[in-house]
Structure formats: structure tokens, C-alpha cells
Amino acid sequence: MPMRRNLLIAAAFLLFCHAEVNAQMMVVNTEATSDLLMAPNIGLEVVTGNHSSVGVNVLHSPKVLGFGLKLSAIQPEYRYWFSYRPVNKWFVGFGGIGALFEGTIKEKHYDGYGIGVGITYGYVWNITDRLNIEVHSGFGAFYYNRKEFFEGDNYDVDYTEDGAQRANAKGYYLLPTRIGVSVSYILK
């Protein structure tokens, strides 16, 4: 698990190293939809040109919706803004997602990771000079690799090779990658 976390941190670092140092604007945000699901998150977006910005959102929750499901995720994204002022009006985004999850739902245990890519479309309203409200919706492909078993199964015996447990479920989902309402504050 520490290796996966380090990879996620490295991916976020590389994303921001690519952004121009003399960025015109920096924005910090939180997605209200995730907050309502008890998955606190924070994001940082850096404007890189007249029509572009890059950003990353991270979230972590020890109990999504109060269930015993732990979730950590990172979502880097490139956005193209259709207006001549980034972080204003219509945009389309291309991004990725990396997630680690573990928990039990209806006596079935899940433990694994997922990665994916997707496209996002949205609109930003400027409430004040520094405060914005954003609505967005996204769709993409998500690959997962996980251990999946019912409580009481002999998972540790049945799915062990050379002393290491292996995943017994992997595949792809086509699903919404980002749907929500965000509140953002322009720092610079």
C-alpha cells in the first residue's frame, strides 16, 4: 500500500512540475458532493495559459457514507476553457483517477486499487472576484484490481501464491468519473 501511495504522490508532483512556474492564477477548491458523501477532498488548480489549466483533487475517507469502506483517490486533470478567461464559464477536461479502497459491503469484502481516464464537461459561475461555484459531469473507463471475498471464506488459503495473496477480481467499468458541484477560491 505505501508503494501505491508513493506512486500517486509522484504522479501529482509530475503534473504540477509540467505547469508553468509563472502561472497567472491558483485556485483551491472542494467538491461539495464528495463532502456530502463523507469523503473530504481538496483540489488545487493552476492556470497555464489563456485557455488552459491543470489541477489535481485528492480525497480520503475512512468511512464513505458512514459504511466501513475506506477510500483514497487522486484525480489529475487538464482543462480547456472556451472563454478567454480561464476558471470562467464553459470548460472541457481530460483527466485520470487513481484510487485505493478497502471495506465490506453486505458481508462482501473488497480490497484493491483502480485507475482510469475520463472526460469532464462543466460550467463555472463567478460569485465574487475570488469565489466560484462549478458544476461538472464526467464519464470514463476505470480499471480495477481487487481482492473480493465473502466474510468467512478461505481467501488467505485459496488465493495465495508463494506466500503472497493475489487479487481474484479485475476488469473494467464504464462509469461516471466526476459528477458534482464544487466551491473554489482564487488564491492568486
Please describe what each predicted stretch is.
Residues 46-137, 184-185:
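Gram-negative (and chloroplast) outer-membrane scaffold detector with strong preference
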Residues 25-27, 102-106, 161-168:
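Extracytoplasmic loops and strand-loop junctions of Gram-negative outer membrane beta-barrel proteins
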Residues 23-32, 92-94, 177:
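Transmembrane beta-strand segments of Gram-negative outer membrane beta-barrel proteins
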Residues 25, 37, 71, 114-116, ...:
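Membrane-spanning beta-strands of outer-membrane beta-barrel proteins
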Residues 17-23:
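Sec/Tat signal peptide C-region and signal peptidase I cleavage site
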Residues 1-8:
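Bacterial N-terminal signal peptides that target proteins for export
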Residues 173-188:
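Outer-membrane beta-barrel "beta-signal"
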Residues 149-165:
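Solvent-exposed loop segments that connect transmembrane elements
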